[in-house]
Amino acid sequence: MSRVIVKGLPIYLTEPELQKHFNKRLITTHATSNVDGLITDLRILKNREGKSRRFAFIGYKNEQDALDAVNYFDGSFIYTSKIEVDMAKSFADPRVPKSMKEKKREALKRLREKEEKLLEEKNKKLKVQDTKSKINIDAEIEKDKQLKEFIETMKPSAQTSSWDKITETAEPESGLAEEQELDDEESSNVNPLLKHALSMKKGDENDSDDEYMSFNNADSKAGSDESNEEEKMISLSELPVQNEESSAEPKEDDGLAKNEEISDMDWIKQRRVRIRENGEKVGEEFATNVQDKESEENSQATPAEELQEEIPDEEQAIAKIQKTGRLFLRNILYSSTEDDFKKLFSPYGELKEVHVAVDTRTGNSKGFAYVLFAKPEEAVQAYIELDKQIFQGRLLHILAADEMKDHRLDEFDLKNMPLKKQRELKKKAAASKATFSWNSLYMNQDAVLGSVAAKLGVQKADLIDPENSNSAVKQALAEAHVIGDVRKYFETKGVDLTKFSNLKSPSQRDDRVILVKNFPFGTTREELGELFVPFGKLERLLMPPAGTIAIVQFRDIASGRSAFSKLAFKRFKGTVIYLEKGPKDCFTKAASNEDAMEHDEEKSAKEAGPSSADLLESVSSKKTEDKEDEDEQVVDGPTVSIFIKNLNFKTTSQQLTDRFKVFSGFVVAQVKTKPDPKQKNKVLSMGFGFVEFRTKEQATAVISAMDGTVIDGHKIQLKLSHRQGNAGSQEKKKAKNGKIIVKNLPFEATRKDVFELFNSFGQLKSVRVPKKFDKSARGFAFVEFVLPKEAENAMDQLQGVHLLGRRLVMQPAEQEAANAEEELERMTKKVRKQAAVSEIAAMTRNAGKRKLDMEDEEEEF
């Protein structure tokens, strides 16, 4: 957590005054007046009227600064107000109280669930009542034979069987007949004739058709008239008018029948009546009522829907992330880099791409980024755990991003292209994913010969004589000469060439730096600039006078990636240019205006070539650097490291930097850490660290001054560190006895070729090219110089040189044994090592077989 909350502020305090107050502590702890960027966010909360609510949030870039602010400012005073400073909590923290919107949303959710339950209970009760009423009607019909006969008579002929009309049986009817009767009974609610018949049944349940009725008595005329009226056939005109109006015709004449524009079908639709199973009628009035109810429900549900639209649905976001595996980050720090997000998200899984959006006009960040995971489930886990968490003093907001647009061709489109075009496209696609490089300073052999020929003032054909057998040696020596000139030029421009030999992983490469190789001799700096400038602003474009290689540095990462993907293996002046990403921090000084390249034709014309002043400046700088090298003994490599052990586990890199930056020549200080297995996104100190200085003398002076001092209660111990990456590898290349081994030698190379190649760098003592039993070369050779210094010079000058198309690899060889006993001891060690390796291989190879044998023996028993 790197965000703090400050309570109890004066109501009149402004944000600049609050930042100035907290910057005082940062200036003291960091011992510098430039503390810009350490406070990433500062906000005083205000009400609707614009008045301060007397508390604020302050975001720090480092967690250590936030903890220091809490310990230092908590309980202190600003003017006359006592403030409380504490670590802020994120929205995902369960201890944070819920907002009013969340409370309203939960209350609406509870009401909705309650309404659904009540509606379900009501529907269940209605179903029970309907079933009971149907059962009662069926029972009444079964009891009364006259009513049953009447219903059977009123059925359509298609629904009544012929034998049912002739014979009457007392057996129960089939399930199908019962369903038909039930339908007729339900329709009685709408049919007035059947409804009146049922009402008649209730009035004379005790009457019987078997008894005769007398009509002769005049006294009983009135009673007989009443009974006759009941037994008469009822005409439709005598039915109540109310039922007809309610069932068929509307209450008011809408005039639709007189309207000629309305068709017959539209008029029928307006008069259509639908009968439900429970006997309810649905016409115009019922439809309007339903529409009114639906409109009321929609009007009541509008606030809830608005709240749901304002708050993103987490389930929908997770479903989208599961499809794309891509996250959208916003509210990030404008100075955040891709490496910061790689460290944050890499613990959750493999990352395919991390992209920070950059404004191409200014080169500054836009404040949002994209992270693409290899597996979508890992992206979902990162979204759940990191959304609304504090990162670099700000609340990180993560959303589900759309799927990345892919403009690549599919296999079907590739098959329709020529084979040559297919190979070019595949090479371009694989160039950005390449994790290795054969030779960083690779140069086109034709360009090398052209450069040497132009420098000597001869024709290129004169350097290579087809009748001479040592043409390959001449070409290798010419390449060595050009490589030496290129090295000197890059060193004067502040390029650290040792970084190129230590590239082991893609994470060590910088997307902004591109090495341009394999372009023809005669290519100018302006022509390369026109090739790269359309993709973005160039901070550097370094091209040696030899004109065989160049280094391009873009202002932002996005421009470098775009240029690399579009220009890799592009045809340029009849050749294919090779691009390679350079290492990080390969420049030791800032870029000058002369090295930059802008998209301006007039300016580019003025910068056609290096002026005499530039050449004199480069020569003078070289002389001053040579004098400095003579005065100060700088170890092999750009810096000298000091190993510090017995550090307190609470000591941070910032505290170590504050302790050692007062010494001259200080470069950087770092405490080695490891991931915390208990808490994700946190690290633990390993109890030791490293401090780098520019020279060995400065490092030894610091060791004598600081060795044995106490930091955070621990007495530290200091000593020089021998790094395997830079210094260690350079020390191994020192030939103590003047003998070196040359590997990757072409099989066509002879002893004479090797002798002529190395003879120009010193006096040779012996040259040996081992051969097989068929007298063919084994691919390596031994070269021994009289002086060890000459051997080191040859290894340095011939580094990266090609002989007959193969790059030579040189290493110091072991010194020959002084006597037979030493030779026997070496052979014994070698045999022991080979025996141990073969024994381990046999054990691993036979482990599975022994397991199978044991299983077979167990089965026998």
From Swiss-Prot:
InterPro entries: Mrd1_RRM3, Nucleotide-bd_a/b_plait_sf, RBD_domain_sf, RRM_dom, RRM_MRD1_RNA_proc_ribogen. GO terms for molecular function: mRNA binding; rRNA primary transcript binding. GO terms for cellular component: 90S preribosome; nucleolus; small-subunit processome. Residues 248-263 have a biased composition (Basic and acidic residues). It is found in: Nucleus. Residues 2-90, 325-403, 512-584, 640-723, 738-815 form the RRM domain. CDD domains: RRM1_MRD1, RRM3_MRD1. Residues 176-187 have a biased composition (Acidic residues). Keywords: Nucleus, Repeat, Ribonucleoprotein, RNA-binding, rRNA processing. Residues 154-263, 283-313, 593-634 are annotated as: Disordered. PROSITE patterns: RRM. GO terms for biological process: endonucleolytic cleavage in 5'-ETS of tricistronic rRNA transcript (SSU-rRNA, 5.8S rRNA, LSU-rRNA); endonucleolytic cleavage in ITS1 to separate SSU-rRNA from 5.8S rRNA and LSU-rRNA from tricistronic rRNA transcript (SSU-rRNA, 5.8S rRNA, LSU-rRNA); endonucleolytic cleavage to generate mature 5'-end of SSU-rRNA from (SSU-rRNA, 5.8S rRNA, LSU-rRNA); small-subunit processome assembly. Its main location: nucleus. It comes from the Eukaryota. It holds the Pfam family RRM_1. Involved in pre-rRNA processing. Belongs to the RRM MRD1 family. This is Multiple RNA-binding domain-containing protein 1.
